[in-house]
Amino acid sequence: MFQYTLYGDGIHDDTAAIQERIDSGACEVALPVPEKHYLISKPLTIPSNFKLKLPRYAVIRLADGANCLMLQNKTVLRDEPDPNVFYYGRFSASRAHTCHDFEIEGGIWDFNNQNQEANPIQTGHFDDRYYLGHVMCFYNVRNFRLSNLTIKDPANFCVTVDTGSYFTVENITFDFNFGNPIAVNMDGIHLNGNCHYGVIRNLQGACYDDLVALNAHEGTRGDITNIQIDGVFAENCHSAVRLLTVEEKVEHIHISNVYGTYYQYCIGFTKYYPGETTGYFGAISLDNIHAAKSFRLPIQEAHMQNKTRHFPLIWMQDGTVVKNLSIEHFHRREYVNPIDTIRVDKGACVEQLWILDLSLENHTQSHCPKLTNHGTIQTLRTEGLPAEEIENTGVIVNLRCT
């Protein structure tokens, strides 16, 4: 029936055989349990109205020296590429060319990063081969689901979504063991600009950068709105969630049920890139956060020029604008690092901040602040956090503590 043999022996290349089955016209392909593991040397390309299913713990591995994505959606090339947008600028963003209604389920997706080229963010090697170091990349997509799988040892990000709407990413395990060349810039689920109406839930395992990133000023750049993140579980992870904007809106975001220890920050409102801040974070809700700091291991700080700099668990970076933020049911039991629990940096502006039910058990030998403000807070409302426990060197215009 098929021209290409599906081996699954870990020796022969299975790329053509798997892609042939994907392209067969069937609406679903379920790969059998492999003899050893599947081996691919080129990206698998997923069309609309299609589901690819692997046995939950079947390994699919990127061949040595493949230097490519493992999986991508079907795209249409633009007549005139956008020279200002690397990789994504080649593809059409037209609704007529959207890849839609597809699903990937199961498998252990092993990028085999020690046997690929190094992370291009570290090497600066961005050329016309478009090697990203990502495991999976989705562009101009709608109504898709990624579920019940493990992603192992990427060179860069595990999953990147750019210009995507109405999606679910759930029940994902991260298995990170090495960096190439170093353990940094290795995100879990990474959203670039123009992503809306998504659910990201039940993510487990530590990453060597942001476990979830909502980075509006990256890729095609654009607003990120209406995203629910529910259930992040990680021990000794870089960070749980980063939100990032310079010129864009990041709003209507709900982050809940975050557990674990984090060596950089737990949730960060960041700018990172230079330029005038014209964008903002708005209508952000954080609740049921159980987090503390962890020690940084040598592999995790090898790239750091300043190893003495530490970040709070909830961080509003210099240059950011937060219109409204609520933090409810935040519980910290700290044994490692008494850095601030919540901090607004100098040069950051928060228009409305609500804090309800913030608890701290400090088992270190040093003072551990609950809330530190070096910036500007227009309106601050707290319940259970008295004014005398707020460390303020900035400006708080309206303060109400009950």
Describe the residue ranges of each PLM region:
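Extracellular/periplasmic carbohydrate-active domains that bind, remodel
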Residues: 1-402
